Amino acid sequence: MKMKKTLCRVLCAVCALAMVLPVIFSVTASAASTKYIQSYYYPTKTLIGEELPYNQLSDQNGNPAQIEIGENQYTLITYWASWCPDCEEELSHLPELLPVLDEYENVQWYLVNRTDGVDDTIATASAYLKEQGITLPSLYDEGLAFRNALGINSIPTTILLNPEGEVELINPNVITTPGQLRAMLDYAINGADSATLSYVQANLLNESGSVKRAAGSTTTSSAAQGLLAQYAVDSLNKSLLDTQRQWVFANGSTGNLGDDLALLGALSSWRGYEGDAATLGETIVNTYFADGQLNGQVSLSDLDLESMMLLGRGAPYDEALSVIQKGFIGAQFPLYYSEYNADKGTYNHQVIDTADALTTVYHLAQVGKVRKQTINWLYDQVEGDGLRARYTTDGEVVATYNYETPALYALTALIALEAGEEDLFTQSVMLMETCRTFDTASASNGSFTTRNKDSAFDQCAALLVYAKMQQE
């Protein structure tokens, strides 16, 4: 999230990582973590889509109390301390922020104080709120059990719950403007995909149904188009899918096997479009699978196994699966080679494009064939120094591609969903959203900043993640 981080947050992060300055931020061994998300100030023990792991607090009289959620009510919870400059800054903006709540039918906002008994007590925190004229419902985390259970690493941290009490969004930054708060509430209430879709439709989607690689670009991205079609199906957006159906009717093929298979999968999933899917399927078989087998140079990421199943005997599913599985690089770097020469039976051992490799893993995960070694490697990267755009086949980062993109984390999140890895999913979404603009006052609201030249791929990959999230 693109929001302000100041000295208080840096101090808190240093304390949590190095376990120094214990008076400022008491960190137990179980709460301390070296997870990469912590460098972005995210909690380390709170899962998206799950209920709060702990809800035992105290009221201003020291009596047991809980965060209470009414029917159809969304709940903001801000974890804070009276000595924290960033908390003071956020709370000073409440006069501008609170009117935003009135724009929505049923939203409440709790403050939960970090009551360690040293830097803050119920008495000092209550006195601070009274002095500042803050009347939001306030509870107190005596002994820091709430903080430790959620793995909160810095303050303020704001968590947004849906009416079922499940975590929708975590904002570990200082909220200072109505646009930032409104973007958070829109994310939860209107859907995580809402603002991103609006950005894509306004800036990237052509009337024909094709997708621009970037705002203002004249070059299109069939890869993004395939993802967008899949998103349309999963989000039940018929009008958006219709644009893809019309494009296929007018153009026949993207000219790329993987993207054609993605469109086939989308059209096949929608009742009434079976004829369109059959026509596209015939085109795919005739274009790419002469004699019922793979031919020429094949990108492993194009072998969408789930969609190939739809083609029956016309597609060499077994051969494709075998080619992918034999393209496994090895235990030390458990991803897959990028290309296979079907005529020579050899793999290209050159640099690995991580987005392509993760797309291959996603296709394996969709048919239940993902390796545990690969999942473990993804955990290591997501919890370590993050994923990078390209690697050598020895697993070394290519110097000129030593950067992250939101699509890498979107693809990892999709893999995690298919594999049932909730923690990997949460961390991947958090890292993906460090690149997202949360501000309704910005023309870029909902979009993802990326160094990928195909910016649309990042936007549409995130959309697909959001659609899958809503299905869970």
Q: Where are each of the predicted segments found?
A:
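Structural microenvironment flanking redox-active thiols in thiol-disulfide oxidoreductases
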Residues: 88-131, 142-148
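Terminal, non-catalytic domain-edge segments
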Residues: 192-195, 314, 357, 363-369, ...
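Extended ligand-binding clefts on enzyme/binding-domain cores
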Residues: 192-198, 219-222, 257-261, 269, ...
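N-terminal carbohydrate-binding/catalytic regions of secreted carbohydrate-active enzymes
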Residues: 193-263, 368, 378, 408, ...
